[in-house]
């Protein structure tokens, strides 16, 4: 897929890699059927079968990688969740996008092999510090560091239509800001010294109007300018910095500490059904396991049924993601200066009167091998 750039003239152009211009599908094809009919047929085929189809002919490969196919799938309500992963190989380089695909062959157990495949046409992020949020088929990017300086730029990547557009800038440059979407509005919090501009500590972007709104509420809790993680549960924004766990209720304008959240929350976590999943060490069994936090009762517990997760001895730099309601763990393992990325997919369910969370491993395998070390910058679902 290639991406088309659309620039808002009121904003300066960020120094990001410029994508190539999309090309329309050439016609006619060598097949007896018009391209439009073939694309309509492909729209009803699961994406996991596309790698096999792409090997049939050059025409099939061209149509499967076209933007038109994504659009038709959306019109026919045949969209699927695709895992997007951004990897950075040094602090001076912009991250590179990958997607989790299935290879067109099966292993000895007759199950499909999953691989991370580079997506070079997708516009890159600033080298570090961006606040990135995925909504449907779009990726919104706020601020970050470009050539050593923080930026106030905002842009959106439309993965369905293959477009790239600059949006109105924030009032102040930000890096490593907290963020969260509540009721169609994106709240961007911090990311700079609060004393420099107290009035702009929180900015609100209206997704429908595509405009920024002011926010009058002040943060009465001690929050660092650099946040490590932020998530949304039950329409509240949970923020983790280097020392505190802060809960922000945008509707009430209330900020408060959550000391229980501080204890076990780590960076590589995710939210599924308003529950926070993260990595945790079981001091009794002396192994790393998946922990879950229920904000409604403020209780941590271990996910049952998956005590023996492979490769869980190395969780530093690893990430979790909500992949269509399933828990995906992407393990970033150092191998003699290189990197092995292992992916584990887990189905979750509540059981019993106590509502215990149980998991079942659906599959796990090596999805990418790299000669150099890497950092997982982003890992989330896109609907296309």
From Swiss-Prot:
<dbReference type="Pfam" id="PF00646">
    <property type="entry name" value="F-box"/>
</dbReference>
<protein>
    <recommendedName>
        <fullName>Putative F-box/kelch-repeat protein At3g27910</fullName>
    </recommendedName>
</protein>
<dbReference type="InterPro" id="IPR050354">
    <property type="entry name" value="F-box/kelch-repeat_ARATH"/>
</dbReference>
<dbReference type="InterPro" id="IPR036047">
    <property type="entry name" value="F-box-like_dom_sf"/>
</dbReference>
<keyword id="KW-0880">Kelch repeat</keyword>
<dbReference type="InterPro" id="IPR001810">
    <property type="entry name" value="F-box_dom"/>
</dbReference>
<feature type="repeat" description="Kelch 1">
    <location>
        <begin position="138"/>
        <end position="184"/>
    </location>
</feature>
<dbReference type="InterPro" id="IPR015915">
    <property type="entry name" value="Kelch-typ_b-propeller"/>
</dbReference>
<keyword id="KW-0677">Repeat</keyword>
<feature type="repeat" description="Kelch 3">
    <location>
        <begin position="237"/>
        <end position="274"/>
    </location>
</feature>
<feature type="repeat" description="Kelch 4">
    <location>
        <begin position="275"/>
        <end position="323"/>
    </location>
</feature>
<feature type="repeat" description="Kelch 2">
    <location>
        <begin position="185"/>
        <end position="235"/>
    </location>
</feature>
<feature type="domain" description="F-box">
    <location>
        <begin position="27"/>
        <end position="79"/>
    </location>
</feature>
<dbReference type="InterPro" id="IPR006652">
    <property type="entry name" value="Kelch_1"/>
</dbReference>
<dbReference type="Pfam" id="PF25210">
    <property type="entry name" value="Kelch_FKB95"/>
</dbReference>
């Amino acid at each position: 897929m290639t991406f088309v750039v659309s620039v808002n003239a009121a904003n300066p152009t960020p120094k990001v890699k410029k994508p190539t211009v999309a090309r329309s599908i050439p016609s006619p094809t060598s097949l007896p059927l018009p391209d439009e009919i073939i694309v309509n047929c492909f729209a009803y085929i699961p994406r996991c079968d596309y790698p096999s189809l792409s090997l049939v002919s050059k025409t099939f490969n061209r149509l499967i990688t076209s933007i038109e196919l994504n659009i038709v799938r959306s019109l026919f309500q045949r969209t699927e969740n695709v895992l997007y992963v951004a990897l950075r190989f040094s602090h001076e380089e912009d991250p590179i996008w990958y997607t989790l695909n299935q290879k067109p062959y099966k292993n000895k157990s007759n199950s499909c092999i999953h691989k991370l495949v580079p997506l070079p046409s997708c516009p890159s992020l600033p080298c570090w510090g961006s606040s990135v949020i995925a909504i449907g088929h779009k990726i919104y990017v706020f601020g970050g560091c470009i050539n050593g300086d923080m930026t106030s730029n905002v842009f959106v990547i439309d993965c369905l239509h293959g477009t790239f557009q600059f949006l109105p800038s924030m009032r102040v440059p930000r890096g490593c800001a907290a963020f969260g979407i509540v009721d169609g509005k994106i709240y961007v919090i911090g990311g700079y010294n609060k004393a420099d501009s107290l009035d702009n500590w929180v900015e609100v972007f209206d997704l429908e109007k595509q405009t920024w709104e002011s926010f009058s509420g002040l943060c009465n809790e001690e929050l660092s300018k650099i946040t490590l993680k932020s998530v949304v549960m039950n329409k509240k924004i949970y923020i983790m910095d280097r020392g505190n766990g802060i809960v922000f209720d945008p509707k009430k304008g209330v900020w408060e500490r959550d000391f229980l959240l501080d204890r076990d929350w780590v960076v590589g976590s995710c939210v599924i059904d308003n529950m926070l999943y993260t990595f945790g060490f079981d001091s009794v069994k002396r192994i790393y396991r998946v922990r879950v936090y229920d904000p409604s009762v403020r209780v941590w517990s271990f996910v049952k049924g998956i005590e023996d997760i492979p490769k869980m001895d190395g969780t530093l730099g690893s990430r979790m993601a909500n992949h269509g309601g399933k828990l995906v763990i992407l393990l970033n393992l150092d191998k003699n200066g290189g990197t092995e990325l292992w992916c584990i997919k887990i189905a979750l369910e509540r059981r019993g009167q106590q509502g215990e969370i149980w998991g079942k491993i659906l599959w796990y395998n090596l999805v990418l091998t790299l000669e150099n070390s890497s950092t997982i910058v982003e890992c989330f679902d896109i609907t296309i």
